[in-house]
């Protein structure tokens, strides 16, 4: 695979421009013979998590394919599952540009995208058109202009729209780029949101005749006590899984680098240890009552194994994939 040579050219251009061009290219080739440029076969490493049979434990994290436009293309690369979104009830432009910055010296990215997406109805149309038969996670969030006290209405709206199309649904309450979102991770706000989603899950299970698991995505910037409190809420409300973690607000590991002081969430190598620690603490607090999907700084099979040893059952990649491309998927799957 010739990704390193391609990356050299791509990295000469603005990060978001290249992202948009890549999405267009993958969308147009996902089900065509041209997917031979990135299609690859990986080893079967089947496992069952949240009652779902995964062909392998390596998934694409949310954020790369926000609108569900390239599902078949990512599947062709060997991912065991693909998570699309974050999607909101209404389309929104996100934050002002520039809003994504590469920090290659640290194998990192800082983004402050702000849930830019074309809205849940558009995502639904794309998922239907893809006719994808693999494992699809759909990550849902709230619109920026929705007051915090009404946040659960946004999550419920998205949940109802995507329920029949998703293999699992992720509730994103941990992006640092939507004001007030992370406050939903704590105490009564979290319990009220989870209780409402769980009640809706029961109604939708009856309506569609199938149970779609709910996972919650949390931040890496949590104390040990906060992790324990979140774990208790997840268990008490019967949530099916947890994704750990989102991007960090810390700038440890990028001090002095170009763009290192830009606002937004930091992902990639610098978040690896923070994420792994949260997974370890979560695993201890959850006591095998629900599974963890580990994400944050995975750039090799060793990194992935570190997450699994800390207590994760599955892993996801994003920033490592930007830097290494499809070969990373094969390297991780075959190296587990």
UniProtKB/Swiss-Prot annotation:
Membrane topology listed for this record: Peripheral membrane protein
Catalytic residues of the enzyme: 175 (nucleophile)
CDD domains for the chain: DHOD_2_like (cd04738)
Annotated keywords: Cell membrane, Flavoprotein, FMN, Membrane, Oxidoreductase, Pyrimidine biosynthesis
Any single GO BP term: 'de novo' pyrimidine nucleobase biosynthetic process
This protein's pathway: Pyrimidine metabolism; UMP biosynthesis via de novo pathway; orotate from (S)-dihydroorotate (quinone route): step 1/1
InterPro entries cross-referenced by the UniProt entry: Aldolase_TIM (IPR013785), DHO_dehydrogenase (IPR050074), Dihydroorotate_DH_1_2 (IPR012135), Dihydroorotate_DH_2 (IPR005719), Dihydroorotate_DH_cat (IPR005720), Dihydroorotate_DH_CS (IPR001295)
Compartments, record wording: Cell membrane
Location, primary (coarse class): membrane
PANTHER family membership: DIHYDROOROTATE DEHYDROGENASE (QUINONE), MITOCHONDRIAL (PTHR48109:SF4), DIHYDROOROTATE DEHYDROGENASE (QUINONE), MITOCHONDRIAL-RELATED (PTHR48109)
Described function: Catalyzes the conversion of dihydroorotate to orotate with quinone as electron acceptor.
Family, per entry: Belongs to the dihydroorotate dehydrogenase family. Type 2 subfamily.
Annotated protein name in UniProt: Dihydroorotate dehydrogenase (quinone)
Gene name as annotated: pyrD
